[in-house]
Amino acid sequence: MHDLQWMKTGSRWALALCHWVSSLHGSLFPHLSLCSEDMIAEFSQAVDWAGCSIRAFAWHPHTSKFAVALLDDSIRVYNTNSATVPILKHRLQRNVASMAWKPLCASILAVACQSCVLLWHLDPTSLSTRPSSGCAQVLAYPGHSPVTSLAWAPSGEMLLSASPVDTAMLVWDVSTENCVPLQWFGGGGVTYLAWSPDGSKVLAATPSAVFRVWEAQMWTCERWPTIKGRCQTGCWSPDGSRLLFTVLGESVIYSLSFSEYSGEMQGQVGGSKTASIVADLSETTFETLYGEERIGGEVHSMVWDPSGERLAALIRGNPETPESRTIVAVFRTRNSPVFELLPCGFLQGEPGAEPQLIAFHPCFKKGALLTVCWSTGRISHVPFFFVSGQFPCFSPSHSPVVALSSSSASVREQPLFSEL
């Protein structure tokens, strides 16, 4: 009888301890109290993931083909060389948060879903508009859902996946469907991944005020704490030597530079100790032809074009200011010999349309091509014609573009030249 009473008392204490630990964990990481849909909306690179008809967008890295994930959980694949538009549907394809095409491969699309990662194997020569669910490979791991971010190694050999509820990011060997968890306690999960174009490093953002950069050879990492909030977004220079990132609650762009190590120092991340502010995007009033406009605020997402010469930042408007709108700011950039970031201008949609997602075409030959997905469901492609400073003017793949004279075309018909 005494033993039974002792067991009851011990059970009550154990239950109370579990509740206390759960409460403490929830207070440290409040996102864990959110439902899956709200959690995805909180960490998505789309401005209004829950309400917009377009939830994710991904260019193929080598061809003019892109995938669009829609509100109804379907994915459409568009190709400039084909009138066929495959529509991808699967019973596990719910709440798509991110997509990524496998590099050096024509036909594999990774999709971040609520309960798993789906790998669609699409025959580029097929005329079918409804590939069967048998074309999709399922990658799932206990406790790793919802999946909010994906990143392929530039070589295509590995796939990373991240979930805000899992403190480990997973490194998948797609051929065997096996994964290795890269565990790092603290941070409360992983929300966003960005693999550097040179393949040397990976940015891993967390729901708390800290982010990590992993080097992709020995898989060691360095951590950087932020003062005000979590890392919201980030992008790499083409050579992987510089990371630009933003912090939730701040209207600035930060820069971190990285050194390249060899010999005994190989395997170290090599990041600078502190980040420097390279742009202040605080709200400012501009006089335009249409009156006074308030522009500026927090950066929700950011992309750097493959040449490293144009940067686009999606700036959220202030909800407390009616005149403030969500816009896309475009900058001219140079990474060497010294880093430069100069404003080029802004992109705004038609009345009632706000930008939701942005992406640069990975292999545009005449400068940079920015894709903008709008809240109305429209997708627009905005060209910036320039001769890349990385290539000589006579390079056949980067031939200069001749501007139209005023006598041969009106101003409205002229292409947008950000640099001649």
Describe the role of every protein-language-model region.
Residues 1-420:
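WD40-repeat beta-propeller superdomains and closely related acidic/aromatic-rich repeat-like regions
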